[in-house]
Amino acid sequence: MILHAQAKHGKPGLPWLVFLHGFSGDCHEWQEVGEAFADYSRLYVDLPGHGGSAAISVDGFDDVTGLLRKTLVSYNILNFWLVGYSLGGRVAMMAACQGMPGLCGVIVEGGHPGLQSAEQRAERQLSDRQWAQRFRSEPLTAVFTDWYQQPVFASLNDDQRRELVALRSNNNGATLAAMLEATSLAVQPDLRANLSARTFAFYYLCGERDSKFRALAAELAADCHVIPRAGHNTHRENPAGVIASLAQILRF
């Protein structure tokens, strides 16, 4: 079994760019940014429980990273960058820390490296279980209306929230809930030590208005790019800023 993905081919000899979306997104999420790099072959992946991979269920991060590896092999992708937002960034960091032959580097946008205390994990597990129950039992429009009121999305205006609620409400609530629990921060290892000892290139993108993830970025041994005029979802709020950072990283 492999993950559903959309492949776009560029010039031979350059590494692939493998894009991983955030929670409740899909393979289209990164395409405005990715299509600015047409010289590179691009793979836009649907993570389990999402988009064309909605029917794929997993029990944890190891299942997700295993599926990602199989997917890359199936496309004969032997030289690549992982580019991930939020959940996709966490998957990218996990996969890279476990080891991926052919990995050039990881570019993470607003991805959490992991909680550091049992108390934080317990709090997060309770919170994610409550959200998962809502995703399973309530209309998605109602759930996402509340979801986008969370502090991490404080930089969004009312129109941006309405647009995201409408877009995300096309998902399957049950499969989102399952993926939320399987990849909760409560069950993710703290990756800080692994990332400090890494052998791959590591870049971190965060929005100028995203104080939480700017603080997290400062804890990581990563080259950090702060994207102006953006909050947590920088590639949506300022795609041109993210394109500029990726171009600098890739020396495009």
UniProtKB/Swiss-Prot annotation:
It comes from the Bacteria. One of its GO terms (biological process) is menaquinone biosynthetic process. Keywords: Lyase, Menaquinone biosynthesis. The keyword Transferase does not apply. The keyword Lyase applies. SUPFAM superfamilies: alpha/beta-Hydrolases (SSF53474). Its EC number is 4.2.99.20. GO terms for molecular function: 2-succinyl-6-hydroxy-2,4-cyclohexadiene-1-carboxylate synthase activity. Monomer. HAMAP family: MenH. Belongs to the AB hydrolase superfamily. MenH family. This is 2-succinyl-6-hydroxy-2,4-cyclohexadiene-1-carboxylate synthase.
